[in-house]
């Protein structure tokens, strides 16, 4: 399992958003074999696995449109692998969120 610092400004912005709301960043750009978790954050008993999608301009649709059923399946599988390697977190309340980073702001959607 590898975790890197934020290599992309959208992920750094999303991490800052969570930190300002009292979350602790447990990992960013975490690679687990063929799976990646953009952000893993925790606040109290809530553990959130985040997929971050950014958009810099007005073309090419909404960032949320970039997350399809296959991407959600891979996110779920990555979370399963991460939890298996971090059994102390198995009792936490887990959720998945897609974070859409746009020029005017940021939107979190629970999936």
Spans of features found by a protein language model:
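Domain-level recognition of nuclease-like catalytic cores that cleave nucleotide substrates
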Residues: 85-111
